[in-house]
């Protein structure tokens, strides 16, 4: 009997990395509830997997579950304070929950990590717009477009503010 248990434990250990790899793959490649379940499984197996926290947070944002997304982005940041995508995502989730000031702090941190990131300038432009800081919003939307001319969110932002790109 003990030999059977030993063999079973060894087989379980051999299969564990493959199961984790499958969960991570689905977490990254799938969307919606399937991705959320896969990310949750990946995190059950490896609670320090920042990629799975960020991916699950993104899926929560897509579903409008901003409190859950903020919690996951925050955990990713706690584990790796250099994760640009976690600061960007959390900034957007804060904006969507009416916490633009907190979002602004995350956008500022993201720009410290990557000073010429079009996506972050676009996001900060939206945050400034929500805060009523029109001139700052215009400047950031223009900066985003200078870095990435196809940044539609910045074009739309300028149009809402009555400014040409």
PLM feature spans:
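Helix-start (N-cap) detector for alpha-helical repeat units in TPR-like alpha-solenoids
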Residues: 50-51, 84-85, 118-119, 152-153
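Register position in tetratricopeptide repeats
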Residues: 62, 96-97, 130-131, 157-165
């Amino acid at each position: 009997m003990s030999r059977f248990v030993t063999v079973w434990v060894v087989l379980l250990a051999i299969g564990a990395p493959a199961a984790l790899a499958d969960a991570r793959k689905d977490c990254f490649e799938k969307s919606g509830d399937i991705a959320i379940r896969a990310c949750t499984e990946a995190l059950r197996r490896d609670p320090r997997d920042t990629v799975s926290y960020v991916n699950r947070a993104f899926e929560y944002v897509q579903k409008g579950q901003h409190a859950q997304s903020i919690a996951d982005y925050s955990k990713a940041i706690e584990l790796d304070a250099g994760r640009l995508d976690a600061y960007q995502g959390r900034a957007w989730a804060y904006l969507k929950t009416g916490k633009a000031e907190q979002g602004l702090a995350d956008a500022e941190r993201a720009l410290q990590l990557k000073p010429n990131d079009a996506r972050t300038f676009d996001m900060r432009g939206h945050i400034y717009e929500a805060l009523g800081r029109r001139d700052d919003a215009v400047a950031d939307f223009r900066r985003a477009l200078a870095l990435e001319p196809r940044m539609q969110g910045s074009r739309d932002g300028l149009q809402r503010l009555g400014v040409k790109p």
